[in-house]
Amino acid sequence: YNAPDKGYFNANVLKSFPYQGYDQIERRKQLTDKYAGGAGVDWKKEIADYAAQLKNKGEIKPVMPKKVSPVKEKVLKVKGWPFAPDRVKEMLADEKETVKVLEIAPGVQMTFVRIPAGEFVMGSYHGEPDTYPTTKVKIDKAFWMGELEVTNQQYNTIFPQHDSRYVDQQWKDHVVPGYPANKPEQPVIRVSYNDAMEYCKILSQKTGLNITLPTEAQWEWACRGGSDEDFWFGNLNADFGKKDNLADVTTNKFAVSGVDPQPMSPESPWYKYYTFLPKAANVDDGSLVQVGGKKYEANPFGLYCMHGNVAEWTRSDYVPYPYKENPKKVSEYKVVRGGSYIERPKYSTAYSRKGFYPYQCVFNVGFRVIIED
């Protein structure tokens, strides 16, 4: 493999080399003394001495974590929630329009769908500790939300120098940088929260509209589309193949080999070692990395890829629940919602949360924008 394959110095392992007959450990010390100002050491003795020192310390007892009491779930109910998909039309009946198309540059459009006002139970006791306790949250006003994540093309209309670059490829002997993530229709990635907010600011100035990132409450309300399940389309075990782009059986295609590496055959002796990425192996969504367009089904509000494809910045601080619109506590992190093509369902639910520094450019995080009236 043209690379060291041992985790230690193995003297005289290759008998055909010119230094055969020399004690390579002693020779190494001699040369280090000669060319590094007497820095040669008997490293085998050093290691043996340290091992003896550790042995004399006796048994090392681990420090066990404190026992955590079971979380008591508090069941909250909201009148009229959850609701069936066919109720969305009724909720938007008083709206003059439910779809808005903006031309943000010559020939470049961005489509928004109307998200109704409403109330729901935010968070879940079935997720990580940062997803509870749950709380009732009211979305007071309807708002517009991008039906898709902001694309490379849309982002480049304001920041033309940005390049989302590539998704890393395994193996070696590459002839390309990786899997493209910079196609015009793909969602933009490797943009920070600060970058996303600056994009919103400039786009607002150009259009005269109040364009920004959603709060995490707005995001979760929009993502759920009336559902109180883990996903808008069901629970953690639901088949997401036609619904969203998550870590599925297609992830096995990251296991590649050869010059200009191509997917390994399942018959390859290396296959079981290189298909190590965690995944929902019983689902096939047909996508290896993030995709553009409307390949998957929209949720009841008309939004695509809220659970996967790429995760999305919100404008909320990453603080403990219960959720508050204007928390007294502030955080140095901003909340990212949703999962991505490389994440399993349990990390991609409607209530999953992550926190990143506002200056971080993350390989699988993009954003979608909203318009507030």
PLM segments and residue spans:
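A short glycine-rich, aromatic-capped structural motif
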Residues: V101-D168, V191-N194, G308, D373
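Second-shell loop/turn segments in exported
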Residues: W144, N182-P187
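Short, P/G- and charge-enriched loop/turn segments at secondary-structure junctions
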Residues: T98-E103, D130-T134, L277-K279, R353-P358
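Eukaryotic protein-protein interaction scaffolds centered on beta-propeller repeats
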Residues: Y1-K66, V99
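N-terminal pre-domain segments of enzymes
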Residues: P62-L102
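Residues embedded in well-ordered beta-strands
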Residues: V113, W144, D230, E312, ...
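Short, structured beta-strand segments at or near domain termini in extracellular proteins/domains
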Residues: F363-D373
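Functional-site microenvironments in short loops/helix caps that host divalent-cation chemistry
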Residues: V121, H126, Y179-N182, Y193-K354, ...
